[in-house]
Each structure stands twice: as structure tokens, then as C-alpha cells.
């Protein structure tokens, strides 16, 4: 269902001739507006006047006849009380021939494979897209009245317009609501024809809250910490590119390897271990470490040989003659009998 709003100028205290002239202009504007709107495919038009009260019985019948000659069917007028003023709803039959048929020529009938592919992709996308829910009578009424009130009162907010639409809808009589109910039924039938497999699937309660909480968290993050998305790289992290200069490179100083070349003093200092600082300084080591290690080794030997392995007692078993290289031995010292050749 489509609807269009047409405004009419307010009445003022004028002469009879001027009033007749203005009334004729308003009458022709209302009729022409309904005709144009019907040709565009709209079947409901809201006028910002009380047409029966403004024109009277004879002109109202003439108005219906003029509009009915275009659509071929009689039209119905419904007066709606808007609180501050009245509005007239013009209900016309649906125009299914609003778009002229274009006869395709043989050249236009031929399409390239790429065009056929794009058409098929569009058809698949349209099929995969979820069909919208058909509008009920209140949604259709609110959509039409929103356009009407927005054109008449541009300063109104969306909430104020919704409040006025709700007030007008509750004040309508059953006869005044009948056109909107018929429009909703027509929209439902058209929706069923376009989407025969449509099934209403309401959104889960947690899905809407999750989406709203996600949006609120994202907005809060953008508000509280905008610098997160507006960061800059540190100069130390930016790779530097060597500058290209016209200066010639430094000449190399070749050194000939011969015996006459003297080694400079500063080069000899490079081999001094005291010049370079210790890269890996040694950690202080306790003296008890060596003692503990030696004690562990002796205990392992005692366990293996089942004797008390003591260095002092071991050397006491040997005589001084057995040690040829003892302190104070002569140069012609002979080996003890333990090491003599016995065969």
C-alpha cells in the first residue's frame, strides 16, 4: 500500500469572488493530485481538508465522479479527526497497470552471458534474502499519517508524530478504520503471492538484547577510549631508509702484509683481556661447593669398593722407596721392587 499527502492552503477572510476562485483551485488541485497518485500506483491519498464540509454535497459527488473516471471505479471518502484539524482519506482501487509495458525488440531480447549471470545472481540473492513481515492496518495508517504530519508540521519529532498518529487512530470510528483494514488485507494477499513459502519467525528474546548490548559496548569503547583506534607507531619502530647523497664513498686504506709494517699500539691493546669489559660476568661461587662435591665423590667410592677410601691412609700403605719421584730423590733413583721386571 502506497499513499501520498497533498496539502491545501488555509482559508482566510476574503471576498466572495476570491473565495470561489480559491475553492476552484483547491478542488482542481485535489482532483489532479488523486489522479496523479493513482497513476503512480497509490490507492490511498490523505488530503489536509474536510472535503465534504469544504465543498458540500454537490461538489463532493462531482469530486468522486472526476476521480472515478480515471480509475474506472467509484472512490470512497473518509473523514478523519486529527485533533487540531480534519483530514480526508481518498480510497481508490488498486492500479495494477501503472507501469507501461515495453515491447522488446529482437536486439534487446538478446542478452550476453555476463548479463544473464548477473540477473541469475540477483535472483538468487533476492531468494536468499529474508522476506519482510506484511504490514498491518496500524502500520499502514501510521506510515501515511507520518508523511502527512511531517509535511504539515515539519518541527515535530518522530516521537511526537507517533503520539499524534496513535491519538488519531484510537479516535477513528470503525467505519473510518475500514479502509485501512482493507488495505492491510490487500497487502497481506500481495505478500502471500510474492512469498508463498513465507513463515513468520519471531526474533529470539536474547538475540535482540545481545545485539543491543554489543552495539552499546562498541559505542562505549569508542567514547571512553578513542585513542585505541587512533594510535601512532613509535619512531623507534619505523624502519629508517638510508639517505642517498652525492658524496663519494670513503676511500679504503689498504694495508700490505709484510715484515716492515709495525703494529700500532692501539691494535695491540685489543688483545689485552683487561681492556674489554666482561660481557658475561662470573657469578661468585662458594668454597663449600668444592667440598660438597668431593665429599659426594668419596662416598660413591666407599659404596663401590666397600672400604674407607681416604687419600691419607692410602698413601701411608706405600713405603717411601716406592715413590721414585718423591721430594729429595736422587737423579739415579731406581724403581722399587714392585715395578722391577721379574722374568
Curated annotation (Swiss-Prot):
Compositionally biased tracts (Basic residues): 206-218
GO biological process terms held by the UniProt record: cell differentiation; single fertilization
Pfam families per the UniProt record, alphabetical: HMG_box
Cited SMART domains: HMG (SM00398)
Keyword Nucleus among record annotations: yes
Localization, UniProt: Nucleus
UniProt feature, compositional bias: Low complexity: 99-117
GO molecular function, one term: RNA polymerase II cis-regulatory region sequence-specific DNA binding
Any one Gene Ontology cellular component term annotated for this protein: nucleus
Disordered: region residues: 98-117, 177-223
UniProt DNA-binding residue ranges: 131-199
Keyword vocabulary terms for this entry: DNA-binding, Fertilization, Nucleus, Transcription, Transcription regulation
InterPro entries cross-referenced by the UniProt entry: HMG_box_dom, HMG_box_dom_sf, SRY-related_HMG-box_TF-like
Name this protein carries in UniProt: Mating-type protein MAT-2
Organism: Cochliobolus heterostrophus (Southern corn leaf blight fungus)
Gene transcribed to yield this protein: MAT2
Amino acid at each position: 500500500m502506497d499513499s501520498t499527502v497533498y496539502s491545501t492552503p488555509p482559508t482566510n477572510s476574503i471576498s466572495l469572488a476570491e473565495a470561489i476562485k480559491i475553492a476552484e483551485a483547491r478542488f482542481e488541485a485535489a482532483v489532479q493530485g488523486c489522479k496523479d497518485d493513482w497513476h503512480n500506483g497509490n490507492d490511498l491519498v490523505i488530503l489536509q481538508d474536510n472535503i465534504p464540509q469544504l465543498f458540500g454535497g454537490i461538489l463532493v459527488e462531482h469530486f468522486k465522479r472526476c476521480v472515478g473516471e480515471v480509475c474506472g471505479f467509484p472512490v470512497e471518502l473518509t473523514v478523519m479527526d486529527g485533533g487540531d484539524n480534519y483530514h480526508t482519506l481518498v480510497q481508490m482501487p488498486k492500479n495494477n497497470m501503472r507501469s507501461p509495458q515495453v515491447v522488446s525488440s529482437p536486439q534487446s531480447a538478446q542478452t550476453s552471458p555476463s548479463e544473464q549471470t548477473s540477473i541469475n545472481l540477483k535472483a538468487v540473492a533476492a531468494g536468499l534474502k529474508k522476506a519482510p513481515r506484511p504490514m498491518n492496518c496500524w502500520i499502514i495508517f501510521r506510515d501515511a499519517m507520518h508523511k502527512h504530519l511531517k509535511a504539515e508540521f515539519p518541527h515535530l519529532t518522530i516521537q511526537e508524530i507517533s503520539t499524534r498518529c496513535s491519538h488519531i487512530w484510537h479516535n477513528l470510528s470503525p467505519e473510518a478504520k475500514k479502509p485501512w483494514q482493507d488495505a492491510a488485507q490487500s497487502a497481506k494477499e500481495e505478500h502471500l503471492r510474492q512469498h508463498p513459502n513465507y513463515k513468520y519467525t519471531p526474533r529470539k528474546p536474547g538475540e535482540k538484547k545481545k545485539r543491543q548490548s554489543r552495539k552499546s559496548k562498541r559505542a562505549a569503547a569508542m567514547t571512553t577510549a578513542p585513542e585505541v583506534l587512533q594510535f601512532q607507531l613509535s619512531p623507534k619502530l619505523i624502519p629508517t631508509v638510508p639517505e642517498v647523497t652525492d658524496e663519494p664513498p670513503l676511500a679504503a686504506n689498504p694495508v700490505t702484509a709484510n715484515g716492515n709494517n709495525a703494529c700500532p699500539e692501539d691494535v695491540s691493546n685489543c688483545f689485552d683481556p683487561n681492556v674489554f669489559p666482561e660481557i658475561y660476568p662470573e657469578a661468585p661461587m662458594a668454597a663449600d661447593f668444592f667440598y660438597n662435591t668431593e665429599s659426594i665423590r668419596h662416598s660413591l667410592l666407599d659404596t663401590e669398593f666397600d672400604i674407607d677410601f681416604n687419600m691419607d691412609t692410602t698413601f701411608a700403605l706405600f713405603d717411601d722407596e716406592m715413590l721414585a719421584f718423591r721430594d729429595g730423590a736422587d737423579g739415579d733413583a731406581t724403581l722399587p721392587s714392585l715395578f722391577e721386571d721379574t722374568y
